[in-house]
């Protein structure tokens, strides 16, 4: 029971992050208004798509750390991205840029 509760808490923590990423990725106008670089928007959208796969397919296994999402979905990521894009995603996540942009997007888009 505790395990299931802990997993549910992880889902609840991850979902707003994924929702924000999806909205920022799709809403290019807001991204432009926030001066988010185009390459970052593309990266956010890619990660949002990977994250949505977790919500839909693996409801009880959503890693909170986006790097784990990328690691767990390596084959899918490799199929959709070339090597430089994959390195860009890792670099953005490691530098915390992606989280900063998403936090800013949450504020601007008023997603709760």
Predicted regions and their residues:
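A charge-rich, low-complexity, intrinsically flexible signal that marks solvent-exposed coils, linkers
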Residues: 2-112
């Amino acid at each position: 029971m505790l395990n299931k509760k802990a997993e549910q808490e992880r889902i609840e923590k991850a979902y707003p992050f994924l929702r924000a990423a999806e909205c920022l990725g799709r809403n290019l106008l807001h991204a432009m208004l926030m001066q988010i670089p185009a390459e970052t928007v593309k990266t956010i959208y890619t990660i949002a798509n990977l994250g949505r796969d977790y919500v839909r397919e693996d409801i009880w296994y959503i890693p909170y750390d986006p790097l784990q999402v990328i690691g767990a979905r390596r084959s899918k990521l490799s199929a959709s991205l070339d090597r430089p894009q994959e390195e860009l995603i890792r670099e953005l996540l490691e530098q915390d840029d992606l989280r900063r942009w998403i936090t800013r997007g949450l504020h601007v888009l008023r997603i709760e």
